[in-house]
Amino acid sequence: MIEGVRDIEESTLRTVQGLLRTLMEKGVVNALLVPMTLPSDSVAPMLVTDAAALEQADPLAPVLPINGARAASQLTMTSHKEKLGMVLRSCEIRALVELVKFQQVKLDNALIIGIDCLGTYPVTGWQAAGSKQQVVDGLLVGAVTGELQPFDGMEFRAACQMCEQPLPEGDHVALTIGLVGVETGQVYLKARDDVAQALGLTANGTPAARAAAAETLISARSQARDAAFAEYRERVHSMDSLLQEFSTCIRCHNCMTNCPICYCRECIFRTPTFEHESQLFYQWAERKGTVRMLPDTLLFHLTRLNHMVTSCVGCGMCTDVCPVDISVGTVFRAVGERAQVLFDYHPGRSLEEAAPVQEFREDE
């Protein structure tokens, strides 16, 4: 890997767009998965094959409408001749790594481009933001020291407030675009040799302030995480309190649908198993006196926890899409933390490290 800084030309966004355009023009990739600004002024991940269209690319936009690993799965799971570059945040990369292990993503003809995440806002909050450029500029200023604060009147997504892994990590990342701990007017790049050569990157090292700024950011996020987990564990400590936590669940399955790890088409909740015959409801009511409609809400969440909590990367998409504002992501992260410690497993850390559900250990 080659590391160095590059002076910004015109703006940080234009510089990043230029880097991506160079990768396409030099043939390192001939397609890109990248967030782009839409005519509605919202942002969505787009598949780009025309380098000129990168004028609308906006990987700096602090919004995460979906976890990009879901899109990457659709673009790579079956054979394709195009060389694909995927511009992703850290939580998306970690989800991608997990999906590689479950054979839902293939990296044979793809490379990962990671960008420092300075925090994201809910989709509706970003859409309603007045001066989007001021919001982004404020984050870039805070990134220099790692002291990131939301824009006045706005609030980071709950998952971002307690994300202790905001920077891309791992040798599987072919290009890192660094913003944290980088002087105003520069951008930090860490690239695989062939990518560095295409970009004309000179090896001049890591910015001196990057490690300290990253530590400042991670420390603040870790404190917020620990406080959120402590509050959850104080509130949920028994079966009754767990039932209360999910008492407003309407079993819409939004959390499952938008979770990058819940890919399984054979999931029991996608089958007729829980499409009970009408008479059964009356029999249950006769036995219990009352039956909740729709039933099996807690079973749904417990099944998801059992199946994927060791691979939960904390992206928070489940919380974002819950129509009744259940903090699903906090539940899964708090439970997942203990399960992951138990198996000494860090989801998304390594492509070579098998997920706990993929292997059997006699001492587990």
Predicted regions and their residues:
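Local cysteine-cluster metal-coordination motifs and their immediate loop/turn environment
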Residues: R89-R94, E155-P168, S247-I268, V309-D325
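Iron-sulfur-associated redox domains of electron-transfer enzymes in respiratory
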Residues: M1-L242
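A general structural signal for well-ordered secondary-structure junctions
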Residues: V29-N30, K106, C255, C318, ...
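Residue-level marker for well-ordered alpha-helical positions
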Residues: Q17-G18, L243, H253, N306
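Alpha-helix boundary/capping residues
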Residues: V100-Q103, C249, R338
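Ferredoxin-type iron-sulfur electron-transfer modules in oxidoreductases and energy-metabolism complexes
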Residues: A224-S247, C264-E364
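Generic structural signal for well-ordered, non-membrane alpha-helical segments
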Residues: E9-V16, C252, C315, V328
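Short amphipathic alpha-helical segments
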Residues: E98-V100, L175-T176, I261, T271, ...
